[in-house]
Amino acid sequence: MYVRHLGLRDFRSWAHADLELGPGRTVFVGPNGFGKTNIIEALWYSATLGSHRVGTDAPLIRAGADRAVISTIVVNDGRECAVDLEIAAGRANKARLNRSPVRSTREVIGVLRAVLFAPEDLALVRGDPADRRRYLDDLATLRRPTIAGVRADYDKVLRQRTALLKSVSGARFRGDRGALDTLDVWDSRLAQHGAELMAARIDLVRLLAPEVEKAYQLLAPESRSAAIAYRASMDAFVAADDAAPDRVTLEEGLLAALAARRDAELERGVCLVGPHRDDLELRLGDQPAKGFASHGESWSMAVALRLAAFALLRADGSEPVLLLDDVFAELDAARRTALARVAESAEQVLVTAAVLEDIPSGWDARKVHIDLRDSADGRVSVVQS
């Protein structure tokens, strides 16, 4: 799989861009702040419908514009597929697949399968559980695009149940049985969709665990062994080598946990149980990586998680595109060498770097120089001719 063409309209600092790409390695070179990362961000958005830098779409639209457009042509096993995404301010985003409109933007997920390495990856180890949940969900969705619908259904039920908790927090004191019966209905829906999302995550962690261990050993052979496990908010800890619980068991566990925490939830007006509060636990030896790993160990764990994702996507039979956003500048020589070795085997690698010296020596790569210029549209990113 590779991206043959990337077009941008009013995306971040790019008023207009048409980039012809191909298999092999391409390096986007330019000073920081000139728009290199915006290219990688656009490709990642095309793959996942999300940015690795911000949680909302508004910052993706260039100042003064009312929408941004990302257009890609992806070649997979000799077949081309065109994806056009329109990111709109204040209204629903739109998508086209091979120039035909689709009902939901989620229908384009899976066309481009990519693995992103970025400086923000350190948050996978040192950041909040939300960063690790997003890592799992993005990867699960790339492997099984229907998971995007599962996530959307769960998030919708979670919002509605949380709103109900806030509105009926006094119902138990007033004896309003009807309001509490309504909460029972939403408990059931939350457990149903939550169990489906948890099952997908747990299955993914079981597949990731040996790949993470292997990748970490490659990156840091002198360090402690690495391990991952899924820790659920319903007082359940699911190690990677445990038998995967089925959806029925997970649903029953969620219902029981919701019943046990109901008083606390009504008192606080928030949902305290569910996959939105779960975590991917990362361990080095017998200690959690967060809080105990050194800077080098943290980077090794973060890169190992991405390498494991690459291995899983490749094992599925479709070579993912590697996106490396200024990551070589963050790594020491040993980790750069290990990552470069993996990158050399990929069908397409798209890299950003402030200076060419950040790129591994001996790499045969096409260089694309990025500049920032004043225009009628303000200061915009351009490709040097």
From Swiss-Prot:
The keyword DNA-binding applies. The keyword Plastid does not apply. ATP binds at G30, P31, N32, G33, F34, G35, K36, T37. GO terms for cellular component: cytoplasm. One of its GO terms (biological process) is SOS response. It is found in: Cytoplasm. Its main location: cytoplasm. InterPro entries: DNA-binding_RecF (IPR001238), DNA-binding_RecF_CS (IPR018078), P-loop_NTPase (IPR027417), RecF/RecN/SMC_N (IPR003395), RecF_2 (IPR042174). Keywords: ATP-binding, Cytoplasm, DNA damage, DNA repair, DNA replication, DNA-binding, Nucleotide-binding, SOS response. SUPFAM superfamilies: P-loop containing nucleoside triphosphate hydrolases. One of its GO terms (molecular function) is single-stranded DNA binding. Belongs to the RecF family. The RecF protein is involved in DNA metabolism; it is required for DNA replication and normal SOS inducibility. RecF binds preferentially to single-stranded, linear DNA. It also seems to bind ATP. HAMAP family: RecF. This is DNA replication and repair protein RecF. It comes from Mycobacterium marinum (strain ATCC BAA-535 / M). The gene is recF.
